[in-house]
Amino acid sequence: MTADHHNTIQSQGLYVWQADNLLAATAALSGHWQPAQESQDSTELEVTSNRITTDTRTIQAGDIFLALSGDNFDGHDYINVAASKGAIAAIVSRPISTSIAQLVVDDTRLALGQLAAYRRQQHPNLTVIAITGSSGKTTCKEMLGSIFGRLAPTLITRGNLNNDLGVPMMLLELSDHHRYAVLELGANHIGEIAYTTEIVRPDVACILNIGTAHLGEFGSREGI
């Protein structure tokens, strides 16, 4: 979500992803290209895209599809669906038989974070405000987003994209016109805030409160 003065729009991301910077972003995860079926020459691989997405329902022509996997789903099962909708490449943890090039990495969930961190590093003039706490995050985010959005184009966390998947997804929406980012960081498990903070690298951190409503594996207020 982008607050652009009085207008709120979804950013499409203006940074260009290409074969070489995708490799650079995922180097720590052994990223390497598997060319499309009709071409076995990875040296001539051409990939140029403005957007990475994890949802085949929102695929647009020219997108790159990142195949996430969970307990009850496997994005690798939908790579050919993504290709049929115009995706030009896929980011996978195991190559499959498909008509598009695949960037093979050790872990696509971690690759999402690496790609988001790379995008953040591309934007050294961006001021990032990160907000966390047991309650009040969304209200504070909306207030600050409205304020900063009147000063300059501002990326604001959309919906509940505040976990270790949602935060990097939001950063992938950064484009070169953004000057501020107001990001909400949630914590469902130990280490999640440390992980998302490393990706976001905030200039300003807002810790609103520490309550006991959602202890989960933290066990106590002290654990949080």
Predicted regions mapped to residue ranges:
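Short, basic phosphate-binding NTP loop
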Residues: 2-132, 139-150, 172
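Phosphate-binding loop of NTP-binding sites
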Residues: 111-223
